[in-house]
């Protein structure tokens, strides 16, 4: 089982110079190979230059030799994946008039493969190899005599099998890393009839129903607040920055470092919050001995739907796929199974209806926002949705279990990282 961990480390000026040069060389290698793919007919090539051709043809090039061999090959491979994605989109029409991969204007991350990394078990230090041409260039140009790169961080201690290390261009003496490492895959637990169903939404990011005690609770109400705060702040800074450029006669305003920093901060804040909410669910399942989590499958729910520009911005920004990935691997660490269940009519059917289907769907029962009323009884609409998702899964899989509706009226609000 492969896991990734993102962290940042402080580096000395010599290391910053070396890593920065490798990131620069990677961007130049990308551009050379990309130009070759764009203009292979004008260059007189008989066949389209794929990854196998380019990693051999450019082996003696300047920028290729400034990188470790496998790192240079991985750069060519990432470009190859980008072009394959472009052709798939062009063929399937996933995006109208897709653009081919662009040329890189800035430095790009470099990826060290397993052969270029040396790590002793239990050590907090990594040793990275450097290519011969890069070492001689650094020695002649800057007087840097480093033979290897030694990176230290406490997270390396618990990583026995490091597969990849992705290094981002350094900024202000710090460098971001993504470490991909392998662990032994936990054995999946046998089912005990205890389920947790999850309904994804906007205002209530995750509404959960516990089949063991009928408890319902809501997680993730801070998500929209984070999105709203950063959108307003980015819009405020953009309006000031663009107005200043317009006064100077700039026809096409450019972004600023402040705006880019806000985008990064927003991305990190949302990602951190999603990690904390999914971790809370995984720990809850472990403590309550829940061995199966059923989550509503909302993929393609946004397709060909227009709900107004405000709701569209919220709905299309919902990172549901990232939630699925985070939930799946965190639950997998405890041997808990994750199942995605198609959720049509789960929000319209009464929790007391014989089955969840179009026949018993009553959209008019949702009288107010967040309230579902049937036979004079008021339920929380999202709690009804999570309850019906579990009912639908049990019906489809041919399983039977007695479920309680008493907890659907007033779900508990769980505050995570508030």
Walk through the language-model features, giving the residues of each.
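Short amphipathic alpha-helical coiled-coil/interface segments
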Residues: 26, 75-83, 259-267
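Positively charged, helix-rich recognition surfaces that bind polyanionic ligands
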Residues: 3, 17, 171-418
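Long, hydrophobic, amphipathic alpha-helical segments used as structural scaffolds
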Residues: 34-37, 41, 83, 87-94, ...
